[in-house]
Structures are given as C-alpha cells and as structure tokens.
UniProtKB/Swiss-Prot annotation:
Species for this entry: Pongo abelii
Binding site for Ca(2+) 3: D157, N159, D161, K163, E168
Lipid attachment site numbers (N-myristoyl glycine): G2
Keywords of the record: Calcium, Lipoprotein, Membrane, Metal-binding, Myristate, Repeat
Sequence similarity: Belongs to the recoverin family.
SMART domains found in the cross-reference section: EFh (SM00054)
The protein, known as: Hippocalcin-like protein 1
PROSITE patterns the UniProt entry points to: EF_HAND_1, EF_HAND_2
Function: May be involved in the calcium-dependent regulation of rhodopsin phosphorylation.
Gene: HPCAL1
Additional record remark: Probably binds two or three calcium ions.
Chain residues that bind Ca(2+) 2: D109, D111, N113, Y115, E120
C-alpha cells in the first residue's frame, strides 16, 4: 500500500476540468491536500464528521454531516473519493445558484424519490438546528425546526400537495432570498445570491 501519486493523470484532469469550476493548478493542489488528509484516497463518513465538527465547534454537526456526506457520495459506496469530493466542492463553492439549489435539493430528498416531504425537510432542519442553534438567534417564526419547516412549506409548496418538487424548490428559493437563508442557516450568505 504505497503512497498514492498526488499528481493527477491527464485524463483525470481533463474529466475534472470539464466537471468543475477549478483550474488545473487548483485541482492539483486540492488533490495533494486530499491525499495528505486521506492517504487511502477515500474519506469515510466518520472522518468526514470529524472534519465537519471543526467548522461547527459549538454545536453537534454529526447528523448534518451525514446528510452532506450522502450527497457527496454520488456512487453510494460509503466513501468519498477525490472526484466526488472536488465535484461537490465545485458546485457548493463556485456553482451557479441553480446548481447549488439542485445539490441542496438532492441532500434534502432523503429517499431520492424526486420530492422533499415535510418529514424529510424537518429531519434536515433539525440537523441544522443541532449544529448552529447555540450560536444563531432565530426569529420567532423560525424558533423551532417545526416552525421553520412550516414556513418553508407555506412559501414553497405552491400546489399544496405536502411535498416539494425540484421546480417548486428552485422557484421558491429564487423568488425569496430569505428562503435561501432558511435553507442554509447562514444569514450572511443570503447576500451572495
């Protein structure tokens, strides 16, 4: 089990260039860092949760990290390889709003049926609250995960069928930047959109 070569092969670099918003140099640097932190070339859910916990030291990020991990792990093998990592990172950090919303939708759609049910939304919102509620003051109409979920559904579920389609999700988020803030649980990032 020798040390993996941290230089990306030309065909891999070509694939990542086509599927991310990163430059060749950035891709090489990210790969070096990824292999330094994950010498096996794969990140497990437990390793991912430890990393995520560093970003949210005042809350419990483990449940939310599991949802993010599941969304990064596009082939469903229980690990994140460099390709999965860098493509998800590209979408979440440099993607256009619509790409970010599609990615968020796939995270919220826990069973992968193409809709977000109220219970799926509540599960994610509860995970977010566990992660940040100790450091974020919520408005009264969002003071509990249930209230926040109700507010999101009131604004997004335009056909009142009790579930959100991708179209409703994207349309709702685009028409009201506060929904993006609700989904991200990061008031400062709403101004980026």
């Amino acid at each position: 089990m020798g040390k993996q070569n941290s230089k990306l092969r030309p065909e891999v670099l070509q694939d990542l260039r086509e599927n991310t918003e990163f430059t060749d140099h950035e891709l090489q640097e990210w790969c070096k860092g990824f292999l330094k932190d994950c010498p096996t070339g794969h990140l497990t859910v437990d390793e991912f949760k430890k990393i995520y916990a560093n970003f949210f030291p005042y809350g419990d990020a483990s449940k939310f990290a599991e949802h993010v991990f599941r969304t990064f792990d596009t082939n469903g093998d229980g690990t994140i390889d460099f390709r999965e990592f860098i493509i998800a990172l590209s979408v979440t950090s440099r993607g256009k709003l619509e790409q970010k919303l599609k990615w968020a939708f796939s995270m919220y759609d826990l069973d992968g049926n193409g809709y977000i049910s109220r219970s799926e939304m509540l599960e994610i919102v509860q995970a977010i609250y566990k992660m940040v509620s100790s450091v974020m003051k919520m408005p009264e109409d969002e003071s509990t995960p249930e209230k926040r979920t109700d507010k999101i559904f009131r604004q997004m579920d335009t056909n009142n069928d009790g579930k959100l389609s991708l179209e409703e999700f994207i349309k709702g988020a685009k028409s009201d930047p506060s929904i993006v803030r609700l989904l991200q649980c990061d008031p400062s990032s709403a101004s980026q959109f």
